[in-house]
Amino acid sequence: MAPQEQAVSQVMEKQSNNNNSDVIFRSKLPDIYIPNHLSLHDYIFQNISEFATKPCLINGPTGHVYTYSDVHVISRQIAANFHKLGVNQNDVVMLLLPNCPEFVLSFLAASFRGATATAANPFFTPAEIAKQAKASNTKLIITEARYVDKIKPLQNDDGVVIVCIDDNESVPIPEGCLRFTELTQSTTEASEVIDSVEISPDDVVALPYSSGTTGLPKGVMLTHKGLVTSVAQQVDGENPNLYFHSDDVILCVLPMFHIYALNSIMLCGLRVGAAILIMPKFEINLLLELIQRCKVTVAPMVPPIVLAIAKSSETEKYDLSSIRVVKSGAAPLGKELEDAVNAKFPNAKLGQGYGMTEAGPVLAMSLGFAKEPFPVKSGACGTVVRNAEMKIVDPDTGDSLSRNQPGEICIRGHQIMKGYLNNPAATAETIDKDGWLHTGDIGLIDDDDELFIVDRLKELIKYKGFQVAPAELEALLIGHPDITDVAVVAMKEEAAGEVPVAFVVKSKDSELSEDDVKQFVSKQVVFYKRINKVFFTESIPKAPSGKILRKDLRAKLANGL
């Protein structure tokens, strides 16, 4: 009997340790065996003998192809050279890179070494990069020569080793930096060094930064066990939830420094032996050309890219018929956009997933992507992944809710984070004593087990899928001598989804202008954190506790102020 025929609605009333009765939601797909005792790299390359000579990484702009054997060998060589450079087990390597094959090779090398990879947006300001590097105790940074000026103080003051991936001899490598090609050189003790590394499933392999439900960016500790579990939940089993296979060509235009691309494109693609087509940034004509030339079959996207494609007349010039899956994440996709995408990609299944960095990151995924698919509804962001539990709770009482009742989404399973780095208080606020991770998102599960996102409790602003923490911008703004109080909230915007706007209380007799405020922030942050609008106000609404009442400010925006 096929897995789909065996599958039944696996919602059940379950006795919890401390709750009289929790309504637990599970996947329609049966649980599977997950070998999460393996290190991440051993799991990823477990079946390499089946596709050693197949394309693994395709550099979109250059066309250069790395086979699976190439990637395996080079990653191990880099790991051995990490060891030579003094990177020890559990040390942190920062990847300050756009999408490129070197990102993948370096991430895997960190895993082989028993080190931890943290990734940062190369467009971050020097202060933003330094904050993450110091908080994570980064020992080595892999980047491009053009970004070295931003991180020179880390080299000079903290002894951080800098490696540049530029392989063109015409590009001079800044003084004191190493070339990436030096790390890829074979070393006689490579196998001995790497094979002697003993990795615990609970060791941290990835350290993405996330603001969580509130506050400033924090290091999210994702373990070997957690990432193996998350990837397996998606692509393993006789009827995988996300059906990737070794003949697929998977587009990777979403930033690899974001957990969505790192996990659901890079790691999932590697696990099944697919070819991963890497684009350093979104350029619609190049993207369409590469889809046609490389016969891309899977196109993971975020709503702003979906919107750009939906509105573009350029699509008519290209053959996009090879695409069988369009997967959207990072923010809900509306019905109009769904219809537009279906028109542009006539042979593609369109569906959504729902994730959060702290959850590993995937909580739910469309069962329309399964090898033996289930019917799905427009607007749903999937069904809870297998080998995990989900519940919906009343945000005020914490009581478990049943179907069709909106509440806070909670997830439990081996895939969730170990915790926030050096922040037990924030960890305890996010993961309760029974192991449930509280997302800060409001959703409901309907009669067909499909999850719908209704609202957001958390303060986070999502600009084209990027996280913007209001608290981070407020901390900057309150440092301005002419600002006495401030609150930052999200405002809806078609192209970006959401943009940050500031409500500002000026000091008495100040002549502070909107442009003054915008420029003050823009000099200190990456482009997507810039303030879009400034509203001057007499006071900021606050609860008796002093907490900003953001919902009141969002209501003002919704009512046109």
From Swiss-Prot:
Gene that this sequence comes from: 4CL1
Domain notes: Both substrate-binding domains (SBD1 and SBD2) are involved in the substrate recognition, and are sufficient to confer the substrate specificity.
Organism of this sequence: Arabidopsis thaliana
Protein known as: 4-coumarate--CoA ligase 1
Binding residues annotated for CoA, in chain numbering: K281, K464, G465
Keywords: ATP-binding, Ligase, Magnesium, Nucleotide-binding, Phenylpropanoid metabolism
SUPFAM superfamilies membership: Acetyl-CoA synthetase-like (SSF56801)
Tissue: Preferentially expressed in roots, bolting stems and siliques. Also detected in leaves.
GO molecular function: (E)-caffeate-CoA ligase activity; 4-coumarate-CoA ligase activity; ATP binding; trans-feruloyl-CoA synthase activity
